[in-house]
Amino acid sequence: KIHFNLSHSKGLTALAVGKKQVGFDCENLDGKARPAVLNKFSEREKAEIHSTADFYAHWTARESYVKFLGETLAASWRKIEYVGGKIYFGGEAAGVKVMRFDAENTAFSVCGDYQKFSLRKIVRM
């Protein structure tokens, strides 16, 4: 069985593939941190967000976890935190790994129950 998750942002479409459930998100770093959204992050998260890149690191990590769960942002936003490089759900460690990286002026996050992730290729169309 193969699992996959798609994401897109400003002309980039990206795909994560795995043997188990996987969540994936990407956001172009040319955007600006959205104050209305920033106010919805937890206080612990806000303490880690000092730049647009930090904002999108937290945003993509959260969204990759939501997609891993198969949920919607609206249903689970307030229950999720991304702090210190780890995902928390309802105040407890979520037990999943998030790999964060930036490439091609884009923030990427992959989430799953994996020991490690590997990047195979980035192709801009």
Predicted region positions:
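Core catalytic alpha/beta fold that binds nucleotide/phospho-ligands
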Residues: 1-125
